[in-house]
Amino acid sequence: MAENADDDLNSNLLHAPYLTGDPQLDTAIGQWLRWDKNPKTKEQIENLLRNGMNKELRDRLCCRMTFGTAGLRSAMGAGFCYINDLTVIQSTQGMYKYLERCFSDFKQRGFVVGYDTRGQVTSSCSSQRLAKLTAAVLLAKDIPVYLFSRYVPTPFVPYAVQELKAVAGVMITASHNRKEDNGYKVYWETGAQITSPHDKEILKCIEECVEPWNDSWNDNLVDTSPLKKDPLQDICKKYMEDLKKICFYRDLNSKTTLKFVHTSFHGVGHDYVQLAFQVFGFKPPIPVPEQKDPDPDFSTVKCPNPEEGESVLELSLRLAEKENARIVLATDPDADRLAVAELQENGRWKVFTGNELAALFGWWMFDCWKKNKPNADVKNVYMLATTVSSKILKAIALKEGFHFEETLPGFKWIGSRIKDLLGNGKEVLFAFEESIGFLCGTSVLDKDGVSAAAVVAEMASFLDTRKVTLMEQLTKVYEIYGYHMSKTSYFLCYDPPTIKTIFERIRNFESPKEYPKFCGAFAILHVRDITTGYDSSQPNKKSVLPVSKNSQMITFTFQNGCVATLRTSGTEPKIKYYAEMCASPGQSDTTFLEEELKKLIDALIENFLEPSKNALVWRSV
């Protein structure tokens, strides 16, 4: 690593005892410098040590990543709490240890590894390299590994786990996070993301296996081991074949005059959405040329999250206007989520929220089910949503007679529940989370932007034959099942103690262990606190949803029918808020509903979050 005498001298000094005055930190520094074989991340720690930056060293080395709503996720760079070669090796060693304990047939069934297109030059860290290291750890232990030979959408990994009957799988991705981040998303043999107790047990195993094993760094195994297989062609073919299960109007699709623009946000989605459109009988969607190929810097967008709306969809919307395309489809960088925009008659674009799209998907999937299975029992049918998402599916279910269930935030809970329902002979048509995560059908047990894009195109084409737009159909859905006006946004907060203070203040609002009874002028009917397991609406005051002690989440039900939730993000330094006014069918004064919702959100922010006092950063896009 060192190339001259000065570097050799520095290197020798660095391998002397580390006297920072903090024994825990000294131990962690020693471990990092002994174990890390990536020259760039090793050098980052050496430079911090050389410059006496003990606080940053402590921040990087004295804590570990934990499983959030989407696996392990952090910035790329040096340190035990970051995503890098060493922490991915450690995580995979822990995975191996846990899976070996759980599955006697681990060596027969194998493990799936996929990756997106992220990368960071300064730490020599890319999703592809991290995927190879993940595979190498397992290959060194004689585990068959199905390693995709190129980048794939995240849904391909859970799909492959089920198809190949593997014991588990990992997708290296940070989805729509900022370019600095990456992640390690774990799927169980069911094809659903891991939930408790697996996540806690894997973390314990990781902590027991922190020192890299002899061959864990040997990524040459990926090229030489006969146990490595490439599932790309087989899985892509089967996935596309399975898409036909949720395609209902292929002939109509092939004749449509509608044009679609698709952006893959510099990620993995382009090729796969093109193939999905082909399966559905469509002409290919028009790609946004500047965004169709992978770019780990996400050069043309302020942030790689299509959920942010018009500000990040600029190139797609302008191309659509030029091409006379009425609908824009945007998959996020790992293609597990979907944003949709439609050109309105007034010449403006309507970017649908996740909740609005869910209303359309819910109507569409149930309508298609009814037409295709006229004699089937509606009581066997289910739809699901996370508890912070719109209650529109609940309203549709009440009127149509099928079942609706809620889960904790995060698609891992939805996937796990769907698996249970399928095991009991139930039929699940659709599930969603408000952050533009949709699942049509059950071929994949995670959100899927590729299939959702094709389904939206089919829905739009079908409606177009009846001279109805997506926006007009959304209005019809609300007129039939009741208007559901919702607003979701967030504040950035980079100081965990501040976040804790905000939520503890709510729990002890006017006196110890007393939740607020009012939010400004709005009377609170019930409070549910998932962090503590409290729910004032239940006879025993205990939440029906599982307790989630590692995250903050409080839901308020107001006298006026509004439901609002404050929670911390499981993947980013955000405090999110969600609020929805649910009107009865026939109540069509949308102006009143919107004004009431706005007033309540203002009161929620002012009384509970106190952004000025707590130095919270308002959403900027």
Swiss-Prot record:
It holds the Pfam family PGM_PMM_I. Keywords: Carbohydrate metabolism, Cytoplasm, Glucose metabolism, Isomerase, Magnesium, Metal-binding, Phosphoprotein, Transferase. The active site is at 175 (phosphoserine intermediate). This is Glucose 1,6-bisphosphate synthase. Expressed at highest levels in the brain and testis, at intermediate levels in thymus, spleen, lung and skeletal muscle, and at lowest levels in kidney, liver and heart. GO terms for biological process: glucose metabolic process. Its EC number is 2.7.1.106.
